[in-house]
């Protein structure tokens, strides 16, 4: 159990009841009582020291971001979502109470992700390419004989989520942010959201399967395993 007050939005009892599939895994491989890396502590806005507490706080924040999106009566079109400004705004609004740098593009190397100087151009290219592909399918083009319209749209969204993680635009929170982003696009273009491995009830197993799928995609360029996991 975490140590937040009962009425605090990060208190475990408040966010365990949330219906959204976002309380699965954080950005660190080892959690539990493991301490947050020292270099990350200086950027935290919360009085926490353990990765478990950080994971809980990030999960609560992203759940709130889902709730805000659900309550939004007039959704923007997909072109308005696919901008660097919106990408940064979504991350900032999701994690602003946790990290000083929420919404700010990464400026130092991490163990995954492109070089910091490439983030802006790679992210813009991905956003523009995703917009172009969605436009083609929405207009009735961009389909092949072996896939339906929805299958093609889901492939585009799955590839989008995977490449967001691959670019790793932010210091932390990229996984949850990428899934929220893809879910918002799914709502706007009116296709079913991915379940993001929810059928795998064992959370460590769910996370491990996702990591295996990401490694396969990284090494081969084939996102089939990632799409299969995302649909479970």
What are these model-derived regions, one by one?
Residues 1-232:
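FIC/Doc superfamily catalytic core
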């Amino acid at each position: 159990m975490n140590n937040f007050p009962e009425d605090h939005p990060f208190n475990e009892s408040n966010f365990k009841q949330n219906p959204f599939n976002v309380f699965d895994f954080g950005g660190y491989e080892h959690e539990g009582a493991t301490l947050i890396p020292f270099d990350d502590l200086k950027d935290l806005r919360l009085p926490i020291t353990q990765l478990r507490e950080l994971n809980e706080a990030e999960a609560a924040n992203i759940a709130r971001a889902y709730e805000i999106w659900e309550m939004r009566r007039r959704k923007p079109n997909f072109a308005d979502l696919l901008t660097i400004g919106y990408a940064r705004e979504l991350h900032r609004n999701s994690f602003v109470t946790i990290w000083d740098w929420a919404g700010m593009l990464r400026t130092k190397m991490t163990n995954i992700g492109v070089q910091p100087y490439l983030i802006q151009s790679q992210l813009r290219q991905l956003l523009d390419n995703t917009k172009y592909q969605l436009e083609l399918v929405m207009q009735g083009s961009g389909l092949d004989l072996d896939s339906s319209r929805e299958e093609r749209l889901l492939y585009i969204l799955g590839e989008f989520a995977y490449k967001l993680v691959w670019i790793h635009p932010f210091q932390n929170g990229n996984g949850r942010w990428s899934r929220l982003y893809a879910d918002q696009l799914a709502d706007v273009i009116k296709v079913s959201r991915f379940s993001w491995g929810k059928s795998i009830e064992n959370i460590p197993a769910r996370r491990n399967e996702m990591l295996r799928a990401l490694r396969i995609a990284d090494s081969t360029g084939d996102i089939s395993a990632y799409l299969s996991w995302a649909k479970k």
